[in-house]
């Protein structure tokens, strides 16, 4: 049976929708990812973020390897119905695979001629300690 709420989302030609993940409380933007219908449905069912991994071509339950799960408080759809916003609690304060709080840790500084990207967030945990495979 088709779920009306899933049909309201404007999925792209690949059946995906962009997702912005924002931390409840701080309002920090933690990451950007994609979901397909199954990922969005699983997110609602679990109360935890589940995305579509374009590189692995499979569902990706955020934190499945690292333990850095995202507990979902709200799911919003933008005015054009083609972008999803998740408001989450980030477990262990690490959202990025680099071991940082946010994937947006590089800030542009300077001007058009001599500007450059500066790292403005510290590594909270070495990724080698996060992603250990037996």
UniProtKB/Swiss-Prot annotation:
Residue sites binding Zn(2+) per the record: 79, 96, 103
InterPro entries found in the cross-reference section: PRA-CH, PRib_AMP_CycHydrolase_dom, PRib_AMP_CycHydrolase_sf
Organismal lineage: Bacteria, Pseudomonadati, Pseudomonadota, Betaproteobacteria, Burkholderiales
Function: Catalyzes the hydrolysis of the adenine ring of phosphoribosyl-AMP.
Catalytic activity: 1-(5-phospho-beta-D-ribosyl)-5'-AMP + H2O = 1-(5-phospho-beta-D-ribosyl)-5-[(5-phospho-beta-D-ribosylamino)methylideneamino]imidazole-4-carboxamide
Organism, scientific name: Cupriavidus necator (strain ATCC 17699 / DSM 428 / KCTC 22496 / NCIMB 10442 / H16 / Stanier 337)
EC number: 3.5.4.19
Protein name per Swiss-Prot or TrEMBL: Phosphoribosyl-AMP cyclohydrolase
Gene Ontology terms for molecular function: magnesium ion binding; phosphoribosyl-AMP cyclohydrolase activity; zinc ion binding
Gene Ontology CC: cytoplasm
């Amino acid at each position: 049976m088709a779920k009306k709420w899933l049909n309201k989302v404007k999925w792209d030609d690949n059946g995906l929708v962009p997702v912005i993940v924002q931390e409840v409380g701080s309002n920090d933007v933690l990451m950007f990812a994609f979901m397909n219908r199954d990922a969005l449905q699983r997110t609602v069912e679990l109360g935890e973020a589940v995305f579509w991994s374009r590189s692995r071509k499979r569902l990706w339950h955020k934190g499945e390897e690292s333990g850095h799960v995202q507990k979902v408080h709200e799911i919003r759809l933008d005015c054009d119905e083609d972008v999803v916003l998740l408001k989450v609690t980030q477990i262990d304060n690490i959202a990025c695979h680099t071991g940082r709080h946010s994937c947006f840790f590089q800030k542009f500084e300077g001007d058009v001629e001599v500007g450059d990207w500066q790292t403005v967030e510290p590594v909270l945990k070495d990724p080698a300690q996060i992603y250990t495979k037996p």
